[in-house]
């Protein structure tokens, strides 16, 4: 008679690494990893996802929306996840801005980090009667409103001395900026200042010297001195050429907290403010958002989770995402492989 062992006689192609025995051949494995391929970014399943700050504001950058450019006013939808699609936001199309002097480029990114964002229905201060006034509110043909008349950003008032009596140099003046949001939100208050060449500075403000500006809120203070002249004429988005520039900044005021702005001539006083609450997870990506996905990954776009782990490029991801591992993982679902037993000799 011949006696045979009851195991498979085929070779095992499966090798797993174990903690105690190193590489081991097994009779079966379940792959636990996948290597994604790049895809479009998508809406995160089960979550409101925000692409542009204002989806219905056509031909507007997120910076336009954040500053309140006249033709870029609209509702910002609530969202638990937001796509940072403008890595370096382009300049606003309303008036030449000196971006490199402040954190103005960060304003859209700041807003994206909130779940709920709304613009106040009324102004935070009366700019016409602010210290150093009376003022007339300046507008620009480069910043047309919805009726194509001259306009300016909704978040700021360009305070130009109203008559020759107060069109003079001034010592630093201070205005308090109250908290006006009504639901305990963070108040994001936008402000800035305008400067031009000496001739225009005298014409507008009665003073051609550099002007000083300071803002303070929530323990954060910023100081600026305006630059006079040296600007080439610049037109934004088909507007009129401008010899002047504006510097834009913002301050975050917590519930009930008052901020202050100290200024001289050329101030852009805060007007409508952003009231923002909740948190929205932000990830770098691209638009448009197509379909839905379990996970949004900076390198791969929208991913649907088919395995618990993934290999490939490691980057920030949000949602129901697989976990990055350096090498593929396998789960053994069979037994340790043993080579076929040799037949016993006949007795």
UniProtKB/Swiss-Prot annotation:
The keyword Transmembrane applies. Glycans are attached at residues 25, 59, 145, 166, 304, 333. The keyword Zinc does not apply. One of its GO terms (biological process) is fusion of virus membrane with host endosome membrane. Pfam families: Hemagglutinin. It comes from the Viruses. Coiled coil: none annotated. InterPro entries: Capsid_hemagglutn, Hemagglutn_HA1_a/b_dom_sf, Hemagglutn_influenz_A/B. Signal peptide: none annotated. GO terms for molecular function: host cell surface receptor binding. In natural infection, inactive HA is matured into HA1 and HA2 outside the cell by one or more trypsin-like, arginine-specific endoprotease secreted by the bronchial epithelial cells. One identified protease that may be involved in this process is secreted in lungs by club cells. Palmitoylated. SUPFAM superfamilies: Viral protein domain. It is found in: Virion membrane; Host apical cell membrane. Homotrimer of disulfide-linked HA1-HA2. Major glycoprotein, comprises over 80% of the envelope proteins present in virus particle. The extent of infection into host organism is determined by HA. Influenza viruses bud from the apical surface of polarized epithelial cells (e.g. bronchial epithelial cells) into lumen of lungs and are therefore usually pneumotropic. The reason is that HA is cleaved by tryptase clara which is restricted to lungs. However, HAs of H5 and H7 pantropic avian viruses subtypes can be cleaved by furin and subtilisin-type enzymes, allowing the virus to grow in other organs than lungs. Binds to sialic acid-containing receptors on the cell surface, bringing about the attachment of the virus particle to the cell. Plays a major role in the determination of host range restriction and virulence. Class I viral fusion protein. Responsible for penetration of the virus into the cell cytoplasm by mediating the fusion of the membrane of the endocytosed virus particle with the endosomal membrane. Low pH in endosomes induce an irreversible conformational change in HA2, releasing the fusion hydrophobic peptide. Several trimers are required to form a competent fusion pore. Belongs to the influenza viruses hemagglutinin family. This is Hemagglutinin. It comes from Influenza B virus (strain B/Finland/145/1990). The lineage of its organism: Viruses, Riboviria, Orthornavirae, Negarnaviricota, Polyploviricotina.
């Amino acid at each position: 008679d011949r006696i045979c062992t009851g195991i498979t006689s085929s070779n095992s192609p499966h090798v797993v690494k174990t903690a105690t025995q190193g590489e081991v051949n097994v009779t079966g494995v379940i792959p636990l990893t996948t290597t994604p391929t790049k895809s479009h970014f998508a809406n995160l399943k089960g979550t409101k996802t925000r692409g542009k700050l204002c989806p219905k504001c056509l031909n507007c950058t997120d910076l336009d929306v954040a500053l309140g450019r006249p033709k870029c006013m609209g509702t910002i939808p609530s969202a638990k996840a937001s796509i940072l699609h403008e890595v370096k936001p382009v300049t606003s199309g309303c008036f030449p801005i000196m971006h490199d002097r402040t954190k103005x480029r960060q304003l859209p990114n700041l807003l994206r980090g909130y779940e709920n964002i709304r613009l106040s229905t009324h102004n935070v201060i009366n700019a016409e009667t602010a210290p150093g006034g009376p003022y007339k509110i300046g507008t620009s043909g480069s910043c047309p409103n919805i009726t194509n008349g001259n306009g300016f950003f909704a978040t700021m008032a360009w305070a130009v001395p109203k008559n020759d009596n107060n069109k003079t140099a001034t010592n630093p003046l201070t205005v308090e900026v109250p908290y006006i949001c009504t639901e305990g939100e963070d108040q994001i208050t936008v402000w800035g200042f305008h400067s031009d060449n000496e001739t225009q500075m005298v014409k507008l403000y009665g003073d051609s010297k550099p002007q000083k500006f300071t803002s303070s809120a929530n323990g954060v203070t910023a100081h600026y001195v305006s630059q006079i002249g040296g600007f080439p004429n610049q037109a934004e988005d088909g507007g009129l050429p401008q010899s002047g520039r504006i510097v834009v900044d913002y301050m975050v005021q917590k519930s009930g907290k008052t901020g202050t702005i100290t200024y001289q001539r050329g101030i852009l006083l805060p007007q409508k403010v952003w009231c923002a609450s909740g948190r929205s997870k932000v990830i770098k990506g691209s638009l448009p958002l197509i379909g839905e996905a379990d996970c949004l990954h900076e390198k791969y776009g929208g991913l649907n989770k088919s395995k618990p782990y993934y290999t490939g490029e490691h980057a920030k991801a949000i949602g129901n995402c697989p976990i990055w591992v350096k090498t593929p993982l396998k789960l053994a679902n069979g037994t340790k492989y043993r080579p076929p037993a040799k037949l016993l000799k006949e007795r």
